[in-house]
Amino acid sequence: TITLADEENKNALGQSLTAGLFESLTSANEDPDVRVITLTHSGTVFCAGANLKERSAGTGAPDMGSIGFDKALSLIQTGPKPVVARITGAAMGGGVGLAAAADISIATENAKFGFTEVRLGVAPAVISVVCLPKMRRGEAMEAFLRGNRFTGKEAAELGIISRAVPEKDIDAAVQEVINDLLRGGPMALGAAKRLVNEIPRMTQEDAFPWAADFSAELFASDEAAEGMEAFLQRR
């Protein structure tokens, strides 16, 4: 489990928190004992977005990307292990990006989300890379331009997160997802992530031969042999 734990700054994306997040993701992806990565938070705020204190003091980089936030988002999406986000508090700006980047994101129905950047004189640039593919154009345009807050239930309707549940059910819902993921083979889970990320970028002409070769590699793996043998033996 990776926990955003800078409650004093509402888990805002400063240099330390962002670097720590990237390092934790890297370590978890490299640890053979880790099967699923859970991203959660301490306190009442999931992530307040950019650390404005650092920006105003001149200690923060002018672009989130230069302090590794883009790398963290990319690693969440392209890393071989599934990332499940558990969100029970506010997610603003970059916090929405973290929720959108996760493979499966579950929030409480009353959690607050918002693309509030325009009200600070900027725009949701880095997080647009992970948010826009999940949203319809008209809804994205309105959310980006108006900067209003919306609930976890509405975030699910927009496609930003997987689903929203009552607050009392959040832990059970997250655990149910984790239990399902643990039933999958580690290599198979990574392969499934890769398919979802890469196939939509290809033309059908390119996708079919690529997928056929990829499938052949998977079926030839030791993990597949073990999995199919277990299935046939009803293990």
Q: Predicted segment positions?
A:
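Acidic-histidine catalytic/liganding microenvironments
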Residues: D31, G79-P80, R234
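Conserved CoA-thioester-binding segment of acyl-CoA-metabolizing enzymes
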Residues: T1-S42, S74
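Charged catalytic carboxylate motif
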Residues: S16-G20, G68, L75, A173, ...
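Crotonase-fold acyl-CoA enzyme core
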Residues: S74-P186, S221, E226-E229
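Helix-loop "lid/cap" segments that line or gate small-molecule binding pockets
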Residues: A143-F144, A155, L195-I199, F214-F219
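Terminal peptide-recognition signature
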Residues: I2, D6, G20-L21, L39, ...
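Glycine- (often His-adjacent) and acidic-residue-rich active-site loop
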Residues: A19, D33, H41-I76, A91, ...
